[in-house]
Each structure stands twice: as structure tokens, then as C-alpha cells.
From Swiss-Prot:
Interacts with the second PDZ domain of human PTP1e. It is found in: Cytoplasm; Cell membrane. The modification N-acetylmethionine is found at residue 1. It comes from Homo sapiens (Human). Pfam families: cNMP_binding, PDZ, RA, RasGEF, RasGEF_N. Residues 749-835 form the Ras-associating domain. The gene is RAPGEF6. One of its GO terms (molecular function) is guanyl-nucleotide exchange factor activity. A nucleoside 3',5'-cyclic phosphate binds at residues 280-399. InterPro entries: cNMP-bd_dom, cNMP-bd_dom_sf, PDZ, PDZ_sf, RA_dom, Ras-like_Gua-exchang_fac_N, Ras_GEF_dom_sf, RASGEF_cat_dom. It comes from the Eukaryota. One of its GO terms (biological process) is positive regulation of GTPase activity. This is Rap guanine nucleotide exchange factor 6. Isoform 3 has highest expression levels in the brain, heart, liver, lung and placenta and is barely detectable in skeletal muscle, kidney and pancreas. Residues 860-1088 form the Ras-GEF domain.
Length: 1601
């Protein structure tokens, strides 16, 4: 055999690594560099491989590794072929990539093969498959464009430390509203991040490291989850906390910022991976893209509105948008918007060109790459010089392109760009250059897009086979076709005939080796088929003949079929193995029994499978027997010893060791049931299993030290490993097999069952899969110490139906797979056959029923993530590559794309599963626990590299109906919100999901991986729709090549199987999982917790397996609701809108008390918030946060407070009226990128006090748009009242302020965004905003000892939602009463310049008035600039309970205490906290502004917002601390008493009264205990109001306007 390996490279590879010279290493590197299968590796990786790889040659029929072998290396096949995991591997190909854990499958060398063996890295070594993270050596160079359009080139040296702190993608996208954690404002000159300070386009990691360290070290002991979590939860939390976040560096930006001369081949490859999906590069060849990437310059525009190109300006570059949006204003008035991936600028010519129109940025932080005119022209025109056109009869039939894959010159050649279908078929047998090594695979996958029938290719191949020089090439093509796409042949009679004819040609030409490989491939890839036959009577002939039987060691095979018979017409053919007949298993049945069954039935439903390989082995054995030639004896007569070529792992039956008449396991290729056993004899292609240990050979090692058999309250028995080999087997002594350390996993006792007695005592028995019931009885009798022979006992299964019916059955002696068969509602009992006692009492039956009823909170989050990932991965890996093509090109294939559709549906199913679980739980505390549970599951899915389920869970948590449950979310511990935020950050949609893609291609992301499937579909769809299928009448094969590459990358993610035993724990390899022998999950395996033993402890094994069974049963019986309207109704039922409050709130309070968290009662210092209410008719709306008025709620240092932002409100006309409207939903929490994120993009989470900004008016939205107020700071945002003219409307938002007489006091102006209906995309469950009208209400308050009572005024209760500025807690005990008495307004008017406790006025937007959140946020009093740590990207927040745990005595607030008393009432720690200081100011117009700034950098604050017009921001230096005597609050007691006199709503007030007397004040509720703890920020006077008032008010009707 001529070796394809370069002799020099082979000689160098044969040397031991320490003996290799630099010349040897360079020779090996050059050879590896030229291999296409290694083209994705960078130079440093190939250098490492050159030092570690070695050359090896293996003979045929040799076992390379077994399923139990620990993975320590991987292979590159250079010649020959191997069979692994049911697939034939042909050169050049790599296989066996796995890091740790057992192989999980066998690998057989089919013919003499050469391979390169690459050792896995040790713990202290760098992995070859991990990309290098070198210190940055080159200078960064990019251009900045300021607001005026002036360009500045930034060239600097970057410190290594600053670069190593960058997480994965890091551009701050304008659409992701506030991705950063908050820090105090730092000027650009003081910024610690060189990238942010230099470029001005913040990389989302600017402050990531600081917040990680600051928050991570904070004491979490005061968080409320402590009393809730169990010990297991705490240990699991520790594991979660120790988990390394999936953060990486922004490699793409690093490459972009390099000088063109500094860009390496690795940099260009990195840019190519990113750029090839942008529309601007569509229909360009790969060589053109490569050249463009090598010369592109990076540009950043920091501000929106910056002019990039003026009208009439000379053009000198071609621009491609990487991030942001630009607007081109043409001279004719036409406006054109361009988005990410679009291009503008010059055309490929050297002529002078001028800009027509003005190009300006629409958002902050726009990023571009630009290519100079000279380079652009040169590259695009150079393509013509590199192309070669093939003409026939004057027509172009093929276009080649000369391509260089790198600058080394070693990888260059011609590649087909486009051609006619005939020429593409012809090219199959032509020589393929090094730059196009996958042409055959690409063609066989994509031919279906331009050929009507595969037979067109088959006919040509049969013709070429007759030519001797082409025979080997044709055979390789057919082998690849069968191995990669066997579904093209199954079910297609024409292609089946082609395959039969090709086999006959191989036989005629004596190409037995190739024929054997073809048979193996067919057997490994074949799937079960259904054939239905009808016989006229039992005596009718079968029309086909049989062979085989278990007595021969084979299954039942079809030996011949009568031509033209019904059997032939039904698809039955020679070589088919019959797997089942009418549901009866035929895999291990005698020949006579099989014939009897077939003859005695007139209706035959056959399940068959093509297994020509084993069928020929059967014929060979039969011929040997007839000729009298002795054959190698079958090894033992154990079913478990029959090994065959199979494509799906499964179980192998094993009969009893004591069985006198032993049944022999058939040589089958059964799919899905039998374990893969491809062990072949060296001298003959037999299917005999090498087994090394003799009878009981391992039994002596099965002591307590090995399996952990220490008795724990229950007795324990271990089944001995049955002997399986006869010592007379001569073939076991052959060198090939005697060196193997092979054992059948089904023989390993790694499962545990629990057996009960009548008196309910139990013992644990460690068994294997094939242990029989009789053997279990024997050991159970021994363990229980029973007298009498084991024959007098039997094993019974007792089960209880949900209705309580007890079922009992005796199990047959040979019954096996006992651990897998037992259900949750069943038990195994040891029964005395001589007695008739009741095994399971009614009480025990009820206990069984209870145990079988599962709830989400009973399940282990690790186990749920494991089984979820296992289930999804099984679906994912079963997707045929052709299904992607059929789905993409909308082809009607015979096989269909059922697997693809099922996997596509997973995201929606799992998303609605999350919502169903949360919303079907009535108890609020349990709802919080379920949310916490799902966050843990998502974290574990991340470790399993199951991004699909992780995304689905995040999407479910952000559904509108879930996100609005404010009271539930506020109970969630802060650290889980941070965990959720970290998960959501992975799916940041900036730069085409760059962060997620960076993680996916990072060093730890080795298979198995379940990718985010919507992104996979999007990428393929872009490649399809962004490139023409035909160019100039020729098939665009460059497009097909790119699609094939994408599909190969997806399929490569399934190249290793998931091993549930290696994910998080050392548990049973087979128990509790559908496929036990699976490969390790690299990077996802937890170190075992100390309390879990790595030894096989019987009780622990049983508990783990029981949990796995519970999870499987739970997942299989899920009843998922998919109606979002029902979700909304359930959500409102648990946390209703305030418009639905009843007259008496005592029932609600009593219900809340049952849910009360065990957290200690809050003191007076732990205040909650007064919430303004904004009604909305629809269920999903976008809202703005309210400033927290009294945020001193000590829940722990890292507990992020619910955010409320006091917004200036706009007074509406008095003629507008709303009454009796029910508002079903509240506000949406913070908005991220509605423009570009996918519909379910989890850009932010539903968190307390966060709102969603309407994208239509959020162009200028920056960190100043929102603020988050620390729960530890004393912050008040109060405004006095003043008149504002309608002329003071905002220019951008066109909002109007109605004129109000000066006597009304302060008027806060609010602008409302109008762009809600403009959203082109929104997440699941989003609805459009329809702002309703409501009158402004006067509000004053009185608080009783029992709770904050109805002296509060409620606007018509809208479901304002979690964290919205209109929100109100359902458990805040705030009753609201309208104050119709104009005198109370008059009274308040006298305090126009006096400090008031709360916001003064509140209004709602009308349908006709725009609603601009960005401006209204900027007008917020006391607002600190800071991005929101938690964002909601799909749903509205709820008008739910603000703080459910706030119970107990609540003091009334009156105004009789002194300012000193007020300050004394503060908690000492909060009052004296030096971090935050409150600034109080009085302006000329009577507006009082309280701003909070911080003297040091903090993780929650970034910078204060710009001071709005009409407001005066006061710096700390200008202010003296202490009370301000000029700020005297009004005496509220008078207003309170007057408010009780009348119950008219404001709607009854005359217009003049309202227009002149509109003042609103909503005080915060304060939960108090002893009076000394009362917190009264900025209230100079405090007093008491009698409890009688509160009790009397409690039964009054809540009035809503």
C-alpha cells in the first residue's frame, strides 16, 4: 500500500519527542499545516502538536480502543479506515477527540491504517485544541470620529493587564440598554479601562472586573435565602459560586485594532469567521474576503448624530457597519437607514467619487471597518486575474479560482467556484487541490439542491467503475456516500438497486476488502424498517426463506425473497435481519420458534434492518459447517458475549449463569437495544468478543474497598461478576486480543435495587444490568438471614396506581434489567411462595403514591440539567446533515426532516415549561424558589454546554407573565439575580451575538455541545439568502461549500457523547441514564463535593438512580401550557392589578402571612416604596423606573434594591377621564435591544425595579437614562411645585406641559415616548403599549399601627409591575383614598417652597401624547447615572407585591418631630454611611432637587445624569451637611383629617379646581417595630395618629379613579 504520508514527516513523527530536532519540528509543522482537517487550528496549536504527535500503523481487524478505555489521546487517520460509533471513518479525518472519561464506544481498525496519535495535555500543560491567549505585542490602531466628523487616528501601546481583563464581546450596543453593573461616574481621563477611555466606545467589560471582585467578596450572610435553602442547596450554591463564568476576550476587536501589517494569518482567520456572515460580503469569494480582512481599518464613532460624510465630500473608502445604525439623508429628502452588515462608500474603481447626501450616526458607539479605495479596487479587480474559465462549445461550464489559504505558500491551488451540474459531477473524479479537500463530501451533501435525482450521479459512478484507473476513486466516493448519507439509499428502490449492482461489481473484480467496508458501512448505518404482510391463511407460504437462529449464534435473517411477490413489493430483501414480528423480539430466538410464529399468523408486522455484513458471516459459517471445515468455536454461551456492528449503544440481555439450557445472544446489529460490540477476530472477520477474566475473575476485587459496601441502616449484597469465557477458547490467547483489557459494561455491578420484605425491612443489592430476578432472590434471602432455600421465594413487583389500586405480579426467574424497569410507584418485594400475605399495606401504598407525585422543587437541579441535556442531545445528534439542506432549500425529501423539526420545537417547549411551573404555583415563596431552581438549572446547563436549554430557561423567566411578578422576584436573593444576569450576558446580541460566538469557539468548548439553535438556523439562512444559488447560469458551488462547512461544524458538536456519570458526579455509569457509556463533558464536570464519595456506595447509588428516575418521569409527563393569554390570567390571579382590589384587604393580608418568608421582620429603617400608578389597558407595556424615595431597606450589603425612579409627571387636561377600566398588565422591565436582538433574546432579566425603554425614542439612551439607588443610602427625590408653560415642551419628544396656576405648587413635567408601536421585533409575549388617561390625584397619607392605611390616594389601579415607576406592592398594605376636598389642596399650596415627603404630582400619558422614556428619565429628580444591573428583555413588570415580608406593626407618620429626631431615627449605619451623601437644593423656580453622588467608585453607580433644564444640580462642595432649616415640610395631619371627610373622586371636581389645585404626594410606607428605629428621611416632624383611625379606615372601600 502506498502511504499518503510524506516520507520526511513520517520519519520525523516516528522519533521520540525529546529526540526531535528543530528541523524535524518544522517538517512536521509544515505537514500538519497542509492538512484541511487541522485548518481551524492556529500556528501555536500546530507547533504544540508537532512536539507531541507520533506516527503509528495498525493492522486490520484490530481493536484500537474499547468503551471502557480512558481517553488519553486522539487520532488523525491518514490511510485505511476505522469503525467508531457506528460510522466508518475514512481519511483524512480525525476522531476520538475527548478529554478525560471513558471512551464510551469501541473503535475497530477495519484495514491496515496509518494514523497520527496526539496525546491529550496533562493538567499542567497547554491543550493543543485550546487557542492561545498571548500577551498583546502589537499596537492598537483605529480611528475615532467625533461629533463634527473630524477623524483622529488612535495608535497606542496597550498594557497586557488591561487586555487580559476583557470578557468576550465587548462592545456596548445602543440597543442593549444598560449592560454594565453600576459604578460611580468616572471621567474619561480617569477611566481604568484603556479601551473605553481611548476609543470612547465602551467595551462591555470596562467595569466588569471591578464589580466581579467587589461584589464577590461581600458578606452574603445577611441575605434572606439562608433560612430557605437546605444544606444541599447551600453546597450546590457553593458549586455554582465557584463555577468559572464563561467569559473570554473580545478576539475579533483585538484583531480589528491591529495595524494591517501586524495582522497574522490567525488574525485574518478570526476576522473571516466573523465577517463571512455580514451581508456586505455576500457573493464574494473567500479569497476576496481574506484580502479585505487583511487591509481593513477599524473606526469608532462615539456619539449619535455625528456626521461621517458630508454631502459632496470626496469618497476615499468603502465602509461596512459592524455595530450601530447610520442614516443617509439624500438631497431629494429621501432618508435611508443602514444597519449592521450593510455597506456604503466607494465602488471598486479608481475614479474620483463624491458623496450624495449626508451620512450620520443614529446611535452611540457605532463601529465600522473601512477599506481604502486603492485596496478595494485592487482586491476586487485582482479576482479576475486569479480566475480560470473552462469553456465548452463557446460556453463557460466551470470557473476555477487560484486561492492561497495563507502567506506561507504551502496551501495554495485551484478551487471550483461555479460550474454546470454535469461538470460538478465530472469533478468528483478529478484531482482535488489542497485548498479544496472536502469537495466530495460537499458535493454528496448538496447535490440535491441542483440535481433532480441521485441516480444521475450513480449512473456515472457505475460507468467510471469500469475504468481501471478510476475504480479506487469511485469506490471511495461510494463508501463516503453510504457512510455519510445512507438515507439517500434507504427507501429508494432505484438507489438500492444501484448499491446492489455496485456490490456485485466489487465481487466480480475481487475487491473483497472494499466490499467488506461497504457492507460494514451499510450495516452500521441501516435503520429499522416496517414491513407489513398479509397471508390468506396460516397455511399460505411465506414467500421468503429464513436462515440463522440463536442456536447458531445469529439472529433471524431473510435468505431469499421470491421475485415479484408481495414480500418483495413491500421492501423485504435478502440480507434483512428480522428484529421483531408483531411486537415479539426476534433478536434472540431459535430458528424453529421463529418459523412457527411466522407461519401461525396471517397478519405479519415485521421490523427489519439491513445487515448484509452479519448475514454474509452467517453464510460463511454455514458453508464451513457443510464442508466440514472446523471453525473458531463460539465463546461461552452467554448472550452478553455476542458482539456485532451496531450504531446505537444500548443494553445486552444476559441469561442466568445457572441456566442449564443457555440461550445464545444473536450476532445482531440491532439498533437501540444492544450494546455496541464491534470486536472482531484477528484472523477472520468474525464477531467474537475477547473477554479476559475467567469465571469469577473479578469477584475477589469486589470488596468494600472497591465498591463501598459499608452497611447503612439497610443490608447490602453485591452480585458477583458472572464468568463468561470458556478456558478452552483458543482465540483468546492470540496476541491481538490477549492484550486487551476489555470488559462488557453490562457485566459490571454498578446498579442498585432496593428489595423489601413483608415487614417493610429492606436491603440494597448491587447488581448489573443482566442480573436476573432469581439471582436477586438468592442474595436477598441471604441478606435478610432467612431460613429455607431460595427456591421457596420469588421476586415480586408491587405497584400502586394514582387511584390507589395495588397491583402485584411475580417476576420470571430470568427477568433482567431490574433497575431500569422499576417505576417510582413500585417496589420489589421478596415473597414467600408458600404464604399469601399482603406485601404492601394501604399505608405503604399511600406512601408510594405520594412518592410518585413529583413537583419541581423535589428534583435535583443538577439531575434536571443532566437529563434535560441528555434528552436534547439525543435529538440533536440524530439530525441527519441532509435535513439541514432539505429545510434550508425547502426540498421535499423522502426521508423528511422530522428530527430537525423536533429539535427546533425544544426552545418553545422549554420556555413555556418554565412559565407553566412558575405560574401554576399559588404560593409566592414557592414561586420564588421555583425561579431560583430554574436559575440553578440554567447554570448547570451552561456547564453541560447546553446553550439551547439555557437560552430557553432564560426566555421563560423573561416571559411577560413571569416578569411582572414583582413580589415574587423581590424575594429572590441578589446573588441569583447576578447569576441570571451573567447567563443573559452570554446572549448579548451585540455584533451578531459576538459574545456567545466567542464562547462557542473558545478553548473549553469541545464536543459535546448543544448550540443555541436559533443562531444556527439564522447563520445557515443568511448563507442561503445572502448568496445566489446560480451565477451566470452556473451553480454557485462556493455558496454550497460554505453551507456544507457550516453544517459540518454543527455536526462536529455531536462527535462526542454526553456522559451523565462525568458531568457532575462520580455515579453509576449506567444507572439512571439512557446511555451510560458516554464521553466526558470537557470543562463541565464538577469536582465531586466532599460529602459525595467517589466510591460506589450502595445507598448513594440508589438515591442517585432514584433521582434520575424521578427526573425522567417528570420530564416525560410534562404538561406544558402554551397559551400566553392563560399565562397572563394566572399571573394576574397571583399578583393582581390594584384596580381589582376588594373593599377589605384583610383576606389578602392573611394570605400573604401564610407565604411570609422566615426572614426576620424589618425594622423601621427597612422602608419600602410608595409607588405611583399608571394604568394601561393592554397586558404588556414599556415603562420607566421610579426613583426610590426611601430605599433604606437593609436586606444585605449585596442585595440589590428594587429600583423606583421618581419621574416628573405631566398634568393632563381635566376633561380626560377614566373610570372602571381594568388594567391587566403593568410595565415592562428594562429594555435592551429591540432593534437587533432576536425575538427571544434574553438581553436582560426581569428584575426588581427595572423598566423597558421604548426603542423608538431611545436613540440617545445611555447610562443616564436610569438609576439604581442603593438600599443602604438615604436618598430622597422630592420636588416642589411650580408652573410650567406649555411652551416648555421638549423639542425631541414634542411633549406638552399644560399651564397650571402658580398656586398649584410644583409641576413635574413628563415626556412620553411615542415609539412603542414602532417596534419591529419584540420578545415572546410582548404586546404594544396603549397609554391610558388618568386624572392627577392629590395624595396625602396616614399610617396606622397596623399598616399604611387608605389615607393614601390611588390613581386608578394599573398593574404597574415589578420595578416600574407605577408599581405598588400588593402586600404593602397601602389603601388608597381619593381626596376630593379642595381645602386639602389649598392647605398644601402654602408650602410651595417647602420640602415635601413625596412626589407632588402624577399623571398618565394619553394615547395622543408621545412617551419618551429617555427624556423623562433624564428629568428624574435625584437620579444617578448608572446602567441597570438587571434588565428585562421580554416582559412587563408586575403590579405585584412590592415587599411581601413587610408585616407587623406599622406606625403612622405625622409631622411633629424635629429634624434632629428625624436624623436620630435613622439606622446608625445608614445614617452615617460615608459613601453616599444627599444634596438638597432650592432653585429659583421653587423646584427642590435631591441628588445623590458618591465620593468613591462603587459597583452600582456610574455618574449622575445631566441636569435637566429648569433644575439646578448642586455639588457636594457647595453644601453643608446637616438639616436645612429653610426646608419646612407641611403639617400633614390637617390634610389627613380632611381627606377622610369626603369620598368623591377627583373626576367629580370642576376643571378649574383641578387645574389650580393639582398636587400629589405619595408617601412611602414604613414598616416599623420600636419607635426608636423609625426612619424618617427628611421629615422634620413626626407624630402619632390613633390606631382607631387605621382600624376604621381598613374596611372602607378602596377608591380608584
Amino acid at each position: 500500500m502506498n502511504s499518503p504520508v510524506d516520507p520526511g514527516a513520517r520519519q520525523a513523527l516516528r522519533k521520540k519527542p525529546p529526540e526531535r530536532t528543530p528541523e524535524d519540528l518544522n517538517t512536521i509543522y509544515s505537514y500538519l499545516h497542509g492538512m484541511e482537517i487541522l485548518s481551524n487550528l492556529r500556528e501555536h496549536q500546530l507547533r504544540l502538536m508537532s512536539a507531541r504527535a507520533r506516527y503509528e500503523r495498525y493492522s486490520g481487524n484490530q481493536v484500537l480502543f474499547c468503551s471502557e478505555t480512558i481517553a488519553r489521546c486522539w487520532y488523525i487517520l491518514l490511510s485505511g479506515s476505522v469503525l467508531v460509533k457506528g460510522s466508518m471513518v475514512l481519511p483524512p479525518c480525525s476522531f476520538g477527540k475527548q478529554f478525560g472519561g471513558k471512551r464510551g464506544c469501541d473503535c475497530l481498525v477495519l484495514e491496515p491504517s496509518e494514523m497520527i496519535v496526539v496525546e491529550n495535555a496533562k493538567d499542567n500543560e497547554d491543550s493543543i485544541l485550546q487557542r492561545e491567549i498571548p500577551a498583546r505585542q502589537s499596537r492598537r490602531r483605529f480611528r475615532k470620529i467625533n461629533y463634527k466628523g473630524e477623524r483622529q487616528t488612535i495608535t497606542d501601546d496597550v498594557e497586557v493587564n488591561s487586555y487580559l481583563s476583557l470578557p468576550a464581546d465587548l462592545t456596548k450596543m445602543h440597543l442593549t440598554e444598560n449592560p454594565h453593573p453600576q459604578v460611580t461616574h468616572v471621567s474619561s481621563s480617569q477611566s481604568g479601562c484603556s479601551i473605553a477611555s481611548d476609543s470612547g466606545s465602551s467595551s462591555l467589560s470596562d467595569i466588569y472586573q471591578a464589580t466581579e471582585s467587589e461584589v464577590g467578596d461581600v458578606d452574603l450572610t445577611r441575605l434572606p435565602e439562608g433560612p430557605v435553602d437546605s444544606e444541599d442547596d447551600e453546597e450546590e450554591d457553593e458549586e455554582i459560586d465557584r463555577t468559572d463564568p464563561l467569559q473570554g476576550r473580545d478576539l475579533v476587536r483585538e484583531c480589528l485594532e491591529k495595524e494591517p501589517a501586524d495582522k497574522t494569518d490567525d488574525d485574518i482567520e478570526q476576522l473571516l469567521e466573523f465577517m463571512h456572515q455580514l451581508p456586505a460580503f455576500a457573493n464574494m469569494t473567500m479569497s476576496v474576503r481574506r484580502e479585505l480582512c487583511s487591509v481593513m481599518i477599524f473606526e469608532v464613532v462615539e456619539q449619535a448624530g455625528a456626521i461621517i460624510l458630508e454631502d459632496g465630500q470626496e469618497l476615499d473608502s468603502w465602509y461596512v457597519i459592524l455595530n450601530g445604525t447610520v442614516e443617509i439623508s439624500h438631497p431629494d429628502g429621501k432618508v435611508e437607514n443602514l444597519f449592521m452588515g450593510n455597506s456604503f462608500g466607494i465602488t471598486p474603481t479608481l475614479d474620483k467619487q463624491y458623496m450624495h447626501g449626508i451620512v450620520r450616526t443614529k446611535v452611540d458607539d457605532c463601529q465600522f471597518v473601512c477599506i481604502a479605495q486603492q485596496d478595494y479596487w485592487r482586491i476586487l479587480n485582482h479576482v479576475e486575474k486569479n480566475t480560470h474559465k473552462v469553456e465548452e462549445e463557446g460556453e463557460i461550464v466551470m470557473v476555477h479560482e487560484h486561492r492561497e489559504l495563507d502567506r506561507s505558500g504551502t496551501r495554495k491551488g485551484h478551487i471550483v467556484i461555479k460550474a454546470t451540474p454535469e461538470r460538478l459531477i465530472m469533478h468528483l473524479i478529478e484531482e482535488h487541490s489542497i485548498v479544496d479537500p472536502t469537495y466530495i463530501e460537499d458535493f454528496l451533501l448538496t447535490y440535491r439542491t441542483f440535481l433532480e435525482s441521485p441516480l444521475d450521479v450513480g449512473i456515472k459512478l457505475l460507468e467510471w467503475f469500469k475504468i481501471d484507473s478510476l475504480r479506487d476513486k469511485v469506490t471511495r466516493i461510494v463508501l463516503l456516500w453510504v457512510n455519510n448519507h445512507f438515507n439517500d439509499f434507504e427507501g429508494d428502490p432505484a438507489m438500492t438497486r444501484f448499491l446492489e449492482e455496485f456490490e456485485k461489481n466489487l465481487e466480480d473484480t475481487k475487491m473483497n476488502g472494499h466490499l467488506r467496508l461497504l457492507n460494514i458501512a451499510c450495516a452500521a448505518k441501516a435503520k429499522w424498517r416496517q414491513v407489513v404482510l398479509q397471508k390468506a391463511s396460516r397455511e399460505s407460504p411465506l414467500q421468503f426463506s429464513l436462515n440463522g437462529g440463536s442456536e447458531k449464534g445469529f439472529g433471524i435473517f431473510v435468505e431469499g425473497v421470491e421475485p415479484g411477490s408481495k414480500a418483495a413489493d413491500s421492501g423485504l430483501k435478502r440480507g434483512d435481519q428480522i428484529m421483531e414480528v408483531n411486537g415479539q423480539n426476534f433478536e434472540n430466538i431459535t430458528f424453529m420458534k421463529a418459523v412457527e410464529i411466522l407461519r401461525n399468523n396471517t397478519h405479519l408486522a415485521l421490523t427489519v434492518k439491513t445487515n448484509i455484513f452479519v448475514f454474509k458471516e452467517l453464510l460463511f459459517r454455514t458453508e464451513q459447517e457443510k464442508s466440514g471445515v472446523p471453525h473458531i468455536p463460539k465463546i461461552a454461551e452467554k448472550k452478553s458475549n455476542r458482539h456485532s456492528i451496531q450504531h446505537v449503544p444500548g443494553d445486552i440481555e444476559q441469561t442466568s449463569q445457572e441456566k442449564g439450557s443457555k440461550k445464545v445472544k444473536a450476532n445482531t446489529v440491532s439498533g437501540g437495544r444492544n450494546k455496541i460490540r464491534k470486536i472482531l477476530d484477528k484472523t477472520r472477520f468474525s464477531i467474537l468478543p475477547p473477554k479476559l477474566f475467567s469465571d469469577g475473575g473479578l469477584s475477589q476485587s469486589q470488596d468494600d474497598s472497591i465498591v463501598g459496601t459499608r452497611h447503612c441502616r439497610h443490608s447490602l449484597a453485591i452480585m458477583p461478576i458472572p464468568g463468561t469465557l470458556s478456558s478452552s477458547s483458543p482465540d483468546l490467547l492470540q496476541p491481538t486480543t490477549s492484550m486487551l483489557d476489555f470488559s462488557n459494561p453490562s457485566d459490571i455491578p454498578d446498579q442498585v435495587i432496593r428489595v423489601f420484605k413483608v415487614d417493610q425491612q429492606s436491603c440494597y443489592i448491587i447488581i448489573s444490568k443482566d442480573t436476573t430476578a432469581k439471582e436477586v432472590v438468592f442474595h436477598a434471602v441471604h441478606e435478610f438471614g432467612l431460613t429455607g432455600a431460595s427456591d421457596t421465594y420469588s421476586l415480586c413487583e408491587v405497584s400502586v396506581t394514582p387511584e390507589g389500586v395495588i397491583k402485584q405480579r411475580r417476576l420470571p426467574d430470568q427477568f433482567s434489567k431490574l433497575a431500569d424497569r422499576i417505576q417510582l410507584n413500585g417496589r420489589y418485594y421478596l415473597k414467600n411462595n408458600m404464604e399469601t400475605e399482603t406485601l404492601c399495606s394501604d399505608e405503604d401504598a399511600q406512601e408510594l403514591v405520594k412518592e410518585s407525585q413529583l413537583s419541581m422543587l423535589q428534583l435535583s437541579t443538577i439531575e434536571v440539567a443532566t437529563q434535560l441535556s441528555m434528552r436534547d442531545f439525543d435529538l440533536f445528534r440524530n439530525i441527519e446533515p441532509t435535513e439541514y439542506i432539505d429545510d434550508l432549500f425547502k426540498l421535499n425529501s423522502k426521508t423528511g426532516n422530522t428530527h430537525l423539526k423536533r429539535f427546533e420545537d425544544i426552545v418553545n417547549q422549554e420556555t413555556f415549561w418554565v412559565a407553566s411551573e412558575i405560574l401554576t404555583e399559588a404560593n409566592q415563596l414557592k414561586r420564588m424558589k421555583i425561579i431560583k431552581h430554574f436559575i440553578k438549572i440554567a447554570l448547570h446547563c451552561r456547564e453541560c454546554k447546553n446553550f439551547n436549554s439555557m437560552f430557553a430557561i432564560i426566555s421563560g423567566l423573561n416571559l411577560a407573565s413571569v416578569a411582572r411578578l414583582r413580589g415574587t422576584w423581590e424575594k429572590l436573593p441578589s446573588k441569583y439575580e447576578k447569576h441570571l444576569q451573567d447567563l443573559q450576558d452570554i446572549f448579548d446580541p451585540s455584533r451578531n451575538m459576538a459574545k456567545y460566538r466567542n464562547i462557542l469557539s473558545s478553548q473549553s468548548m469541545q464536543p459535546p455541545i448543544i448550540p443555541l439553535f436559533p443562531v444556527v438556523k439564522k447563520d445557515m439562512t443568511f448563507l442561503h439568502e445572502g448568496n445566489d444559488s446560480k451565477v451566470d447560469g452556473l451553480v454557485n458551488f462556493e455558496k454550497l461549500r460554505m453551507i456544507s462547512k457550516e453544517i459540518r461544524q454543527v455536526v462536529r458538536m455531536t462527535s462526542a457523547n454526553m456522559d451523565p456519570a462525568m458531568m457532575f458526579r462520580q455515579r453509576s455509569l449506567s444507572q439512571g441514564s439512557t446511555n451510560s457509556n458516554m464521553l466526558d463533558v470537557q470543562g463541565g464536570a464538577h469536582k465531586k463535593r466532599a460529602r459525595r464519595s467517589s466510591l460506589l456506595n450502595a445507598k448513594k447509588l440508589y438515591e442517585d438512580a432514584q433521582m434520575a428516575r424521578k427526573v425522567k418521569q417528570y420530564l416525560s409527563s410534562l404538561d406544558v401550557e402554551t397559551d400566553e393569554e392563560k399565562f397572563q390570567m394566572m399571573s394576574l390571579q397571583w399578583e393582581p392589578a390594584y384596580g381589582t382590589l376588594t373593599k377589605n384587604l384583610s383576606e389578602k393580608r392573611s394570605a400573604k402571612s401564610s407565604e411570609m418568608s422566615p426572614v426576620p421582620m424589618r425594622s423601621a429603617g427597612q422602608t419600602t416604596k410608595a409607588h405611583l400608578h399608571q394604568p394601561h389597558r393592554v397586558s404588556q407595556v414599556l415603562q420607566v423606573p421610579a426613583v426610590n424615595l426611601h430605599p433604606i431597606r437593609k436586606k444585605g450589603q449585596t442585595k440589590d434594591p428594587a429600583l423606583n425612579t421618581s419621574l416628573p409627571q405631566k398634568v393632563l387636561g381635566t376633561t380626560e377621564e377614566i373610570s372602571g377600566k381594568k388594567h391587566t398588565e403593568d410595565t415592562i422591565s428594562v429594555a435592551s435591544s429591540l432593534h437587533s436582538s432576536p425575538p427571544a433574546s434574553p438581553q436582560g432579566s426581569p428584575h426588581k425595579g427595572y423598566t423597558l425603554i421604548p426603542s423608538a425614542k431611545s436613540d440617545n439612551l445611555s447610562d443616564s437614562s436610569h438609576s439604581e439607588i442603593s438600599s443602604r443610602s438615604s436618598i430622597v427625590s422630592n420636588c416642589s411645585v411650580d408652573s410650567m408653560s406649555a411652551a416648555l415642551q421638549d423639542e425631541r419628544c414634542s411633549s406638552q406641559a399644560l399651564a397650571v396656576p402658580e398656586s398649584t405648587g410644583a409641576l413635574e413635567k413628563t415626556e412620553h415616548a411615542s415609539g412603542i408601536g414602532d417596534h419591529s421585533q419584540h420578545g415572546p409575549g410582548w404586546t404594544l403599549l396603549k397609554p391610558s388617561l388618568i386624572k392627577c390625584l392629590a395624595v396625602s397619607s396616614s399610617v396606622s399601627n397596623e399598616e399604611i392605611s387608605q389615607e393614601h390616594i390611588i390613581i386608578e389601579a394599573a398593574d404597574s409591575g415589578r420595578g416600574s415607576w407605577t408599581s405598588c406592592s400588593s402586600s404593602s398594605h397601602d389603601n388608597f383614598q381619593s381626596l376630593p376636598n379642595p381645602k386639602s389642596w389649598d392647605f398644601l399650596n402654602s408650602y410651595r417652597h417647602t420640602h415635601l415627603d413625596d412626589p407632588i404630582a402624577e399623571v398618565e400619558p394619553t394615547d395622543s401624547e408621545p412617551y419618551s422614556c429617555s427624556k423623562s428619565c433624564s428629568r428624574t429628580c435625584g437620579q444617578c447615572k448608572g446602567s441597570l444591573e438587571r434588565k428585562s428583555w421580554t416582559s412587563s413588570s408586575s403590579l405585584s407585591d412590592t415587599y411581601e415580608p413587610n408585616y407587623g406593626t406599622v406606625k403612622q407618620r405625622v409631622l411633629e418631630s424635629t429634624p434632629a429626631e428625624s436624623s436620630e431615627g435613622l439606622d446608625p449605619k445608614d445614617a452615617t454611611d460615608p459613601v453616599y451623601k444627599t444634596v438638597t437644593s432650592s432653585t429659583e423656580k421653587g423646584l427642590i432637587v435631591y441628588c445623590v453622588t458618591s465620593p468613591k467608585k462603587d459597583d452600582r453607580y456610574r455618574e449622575p445624569p445631566p441636569t435637566p433644564p429648569g433644575y439646578l444640580g448642586i455639588s457636594l462642595a457647595d453644601l453643608k451637611e446637616g438639616p436645612h432649616t429653610h426646608l419646612k415640610p407641611p403639617d400633614y395631619s390637617v390634610a389627613v383629617q380632611r381627606s377622610k371627610m369626603m369620598h368623591n373622586s377627583l373626576s367629580r371636581l370642576p376643571p378649574a379646581s383641578l387645574s389650580s389645585n393639582l398636587v400629589a404626594c405619595v408617601p412611602s410606607k414604613i414598616v416599623t417595630q420600636p419607635q426608636r428605629h423609625n426612619l424618617q428621611p427628611f421629615h422634620p416632624k413626626l407624630g402619632d395618629v390613633t390606631d382607631a383611625d387605621s382600624e376604621a379606615d381598613e374596611n372602607e372601600q378602596v377608591s380608584a379613579v
